[in-house]
From Swiss-Prot:
Gene that encodes it: nuoD
Superkingdom assignment: Bacteria
Subunit architecture: NDH-1 is composed of 14 different subunits. Subunits NuoB, C, D, E, F, and G constitute the peripheral sector of the complex.
Keywords, ordered alphabetically: Cell inner membrane, Cell membrane, Membrane, NAD, Quinone, Translocase, Transport, Ubiquinone
EC numbers: 7.1.1.-
Functional summary from the UniProt entry: NDH-1 shuttles electrons from NADH, via FMN and iron-sulfur (Fe-S) centers, to quinones in the respiratory chain. The immediate electron acceptor for the enzyme in this species is believed to be ubiquinone. Couples the redox reaction to proton translocation (for every two electrons transferred, four hydrogen ions are translocated across the cytoplasmic membrane), and thus conserves the redox energy in a proton gradient.
Protein name: NADH-quinone oxidoreductase subunit D
Length: 417
């Protein structure tokens, strides 16, 4: 009699639902998954090693490219680690700007997650809506840094520059006539803060639109409820953080439990799931949209009323203004040294973590007193989540793996590093 064997199948890395370069080796009994083995490393770029040969400031753009949909949140952990070693005081205005952009980044990340997750499961409309709404936030990125994605806006000691007083305007073209262009420029007449405030007024309506399309949708619930269930104890044992941990009912958020910057002065809530399945994690992230919106509004109000410096006045770390540089020899020397040699960080080691859109993103930095790190270790939240994919997908169908990869919000830049 013929022996019945399990069937081995490769899922990805060319599969559209594999989120980049994920290769899964699935062991199947019929269509039921017995084992899922993620193969990683296809996007390994040696970021940790490269950082050892770059000055501290030169590594900031590398951070953007780790989780390349949560750019500024990555930078934040890195500059916080440097500030801890240097014992730098960050101006309060810079702290508010950072928090505001961290939350803008959270919305950017969750919009991409929602669009991709829905598209994987088969809902096309949400994907188009989400990308329509990301556009405004990308413009906010562009107005402060000149780049829509890889901003390199945070600096040790503050941020690169203050918020601009005017927004870039659309110009009429063959595709968009004068009338359409005028309508598109309507909310761009004021400063960046006016533009962001206008977005925060509109955004709750957008979130309601997503909920109308998905939350009570029968197909959506059939594909998500009871899939990839993780108990609170297992979630903690597996090293889950962020929405993956909160979806299992554990109220852990670094913004509340280990506050950094000005989070302890802001009013917001931590959404927590009940069942620990894909649907609960969806609901947690949807509520995070609303809470991030609340935080951004509070930051906008504060930033309007409180002008001030946005980067430290210690010219050993931050460059002097161009006006001073052209009038004073000492400032010119500071400027020259900063951009040739960089600044030296006292010997020591530190760990700085932020509540990244995907979980706890941490940077462990060791300095030997030179102008480059002796060692930099990146603690990527997605790495622990992907490691649990095997446990989460056992006993489910192949189609459910797609929903589980979606709910984990996998981005390979940070996993392979």
């Amino acid at each position: 009699m013929a022996e019945i064997r399990n069937y081995t199948m490769n899922f990805g890395p060319q599969h559209p639902a594999a989120h980049g370069v994920l290769r899964l080796v699935l062991e199947l009994d019929g269509e039921v998954i017995q084992r899922a083995d993620p193969h990683i490393g296809l996007l390994h770029r040696a970021t940790e090693k490269l950082a050892e040969y770059k000055t501290y400031i030169q590594s900031v753009p590398y951070m953007d490219r780790l989780d390349y949909v949560s750019m500024m949140a990555n930078e934040h952990a890195y500059v916080m680690a440097i500030e801890k070693l240097l014992q730098l005081e960050v101006p309060i205005r810079a702290q508010y700007i950072r928090v505001m952009f961290d939350e803008i980044t959270r919305i950017l990340n969750h919009l991409l997650w929602l669009g991709a997750h829905a598209l994987d499961v088969g809902a096309m409309t949400v994907f188009l809506y989400a990308f329509r709404d990301r556009e405004d936030l990308m413009d906010a990125y562009e107005s402060v840094s000149g780049a829509r994605m890889h901003a390199a806006y945070y600096r040790p000691g503050g941020v690169y520059r203050d918020l601009p007083d005017s927004m870039p305007q659309y110009k009429a073209s063959k595709i968009h006539d004068e009338k359409t262009t005028k309508a598109r420029n309507e909310n761009r007449q004021g400063s960046l803060l006016d533009f962001i405030e206008d977005f925060t007024n509109r955004f709750p309506t957008y979130v309601d639109e997503y909920e109308t399309l998905l939350t009570d949708n029968r197909i959506w619930k059939q594909r998500l409820v009871g899939i990839g269930t993780v108990s609170p104890e297992r979630a903690m044992a597996l090293g889950f953080t962020g929405p993956m941990l909160r979806g299992s009912g554990v109220e852990w958020d670094l913004r509340k439990k280990q506050p950094y910057e000005v989070y302890d002065q802001l009013d917001f809530d931590i959404p927590v799931g009940v069942n620990g399945d894909c649907y609960d994690r969806y609901l947690v992230r949807i509520e995070e949209f609303r809470q991030s919106n609340r935080i951004i509004r509070q930051c906008v109000d504060w930033l309007r009323k409180n002008p001030g410096p946005v980067i430290t006045d210690n010219h050993k770390v931050a460059p002097p203004s161009r006006v001073n540089m052209k009038q004073n020899m000492e400032e010119l020397i500071h400027h020259f040294k900063l951009f040739t040699e960089g600044f030296h960080v006292p010997p020591g080691e530190t760990y700085a973590a932020v509540e990244h859109p995907k979980g706890e993103f941490g940077i462990y930095l060791i300095s030997d007193g030179a102008n480059m790190p002796y060692r930099m270790k990146i603690r990527a939240p997605g790495f622990a989540h992907l490691a649990a994919l095997d446990e989460m997908s056992r006993g489910h169908m192949i189609a459910d793996v797609v929903a589980i990869i979606g709910t984990q919000d996998i981005v390979f830049g940070e996993i392979d590093r």
